[in-house]
Amino acid sequence: MIPPRALLLISVWMVSGGRTLLVTVQDTQRYTMLFSSIILKCDYSTSAQIQDVAVTWRFKSFCKDPIFDYYSAAYQASLSLNQDPANDCNDNQREVRIVIQKRGQNEPVLGVDYRQRKITIQNKADLVISEVMWWDHGVYFCSVEAQGDTSGDPDKEVKLVVLHWLTVLFIILGALFLFLLIGICWCQCCPHCCCCYVRCPCCPTRCCCPEEALARHNYMKQMESMTPWMLDRPYYAGADRNSQHSSYQLNPLLQRDLSLQSSLPMPAPMSFSPPNNKVLDFLETEIKNLNTAQPLMSAPHYGGASHHPSMLSSLSEVGVREVDRRVIQLPPLVEHIVSSHRSSNSSHQRRNMGSWDPLDGERDRRRNRQLDDSLSNETNWRAQERQHSDRSSGHRRDPPNNRRPRRDVSPPRRYGDSYSDESANNDPRGRSNPHSDRARPTERRRSPERGDQGRRGSPDRYSRSQRHRRSYSPPHRRDSWSSEDETRNNQRGRGRRERSYEWPEEKPPSYKSLEICAGKAPTQRPGAVRQSDRASSRSGRSMVI
């Protein structure tokens, strides 16, 4: 039999155990952004009737901010002591607000501070915040009250962390990106100030530095800079592309996308003075003064060795002989002709030595009359010179009384040496002088120790004097030709004139008259005219320009 006291204790335990209240939450901590929506889950279990249950959501601010104060020394010390520094503080140290309340099946009622907010309770006790604000950052407590349930855990907490600082940062970055995007789109759509190569989403077909628009713009800039060099009449930017004065006819890119409906007159070109080029002016003046009516004589074609090369052909043998040449005939040269060729040379000379100048005709006839007398004296003088040279065996100086004065019938020449040694072997009529080969010197320049011997009548001196009288070219020496050489040559020629026949005048024949041979070539006998293969245009017969 159970005592009555035991039965009382059992009945009290059963009654108290069956009416216990239990509140649960799904997440104890949530993170959200500003202006976002969030749902805080909360549920409860009770034996009371649903109309007797009241649900209340309260807000309490953080004691210490879990974001900004997380790395502080006090926050880390509380964590080391297994405390919650964000929530372990009295209510008088933080802000406490009632968010919303609901009893039974009635409509929820917002708190005083949340009257204008979009906040509600759904299901049993879920809190729904449609738009999270800056001050929603804190701890939310879900409390349930049921009549008759006095035991159990009537409330639970949920931490809501609002990332307001990150939102502000994102807003700032978004604004900068917006300005950057606007700037990119603006500069991409305006080719005159394009400075970037990034594709713009606002106008992908027209932007990203269009090369065609840039080419048109650059071409227009070049055309504006070239305005002074265009025609005197103003051109128009919107003219017809087939027009002669159109500025777009040179670039095909300018033929497209022309939005100008009317012609825009461009400024008139500026006048510039022509550049001062004295060389071009001089050449134009010379060309204008050129006498085109003056006939030009082409050089006659000779075959083989009988061709007389000109000065130009001697300087450049390639491609000059076929050029039309203007021949300036120089005065004939009187040479010492040996007795073996006396008759043929004298007759040929009388036929070919025509008066090249009317003023010098009398002088030429007088010179021809003296030629026969000088030939005999010249032969005797050659024999005596050869005997004296054999006797002296070194071209020593002969006594003055043993020397026979030499007659020089040729006019004095100003220049000493010729261009080449071939002129000493060939007379101006194309025949080779066999006796001049024996008298040819082995070197061009006279050595200082043999200077007196050359003046006294040695064979070398005679051959050099022959070349001196045949050439009008300057001396071919290693040193430069100066006035001292000219003075020495004049003295030498003056000494020869004292021992020769008296000339009618001191100067050689005048060169002021030029005979232009147009269409006539000098007649020569094929048998008598012959020239060596080494003959060049350096002879004294003609000068070709």
Swiss-Prot record:
**Keywords recorded for this protein, A-Z:** Cell junction, Cell membrane, Disulfide bond, Immunoglobulin domain, Membrane, Receptor, Signal, Tight junction, Transmembrane, Transmembrane helix
GO CC field: bicellular tight junction; plasma membrane; tight junction; tricellular tight junction
Region (Disordered): which ranges? Answer: 338-545
Summary of the function given for this chain in its UniProt record: Maintains epithelial barrier function by recruiting MARVELD2/tricellulin to tricellular tight junctions (tTJs).
Gene from which this protein is expressed:
ildr1
Name-wise, this protein is Immunoglobulin-like domain-containing receptor 1
Q: Please give the InterPro entries that the UniProt record associates with this protein.
A: Ig-like_dom, Ig-like_dom_sf, Ig-like_domain-LISCH7, Ig-like_fold, LISCH7
Compositional bias, Basic and acidic residues, is annotated for 360-372, 383-416, 428-463, 476-489, 498-509
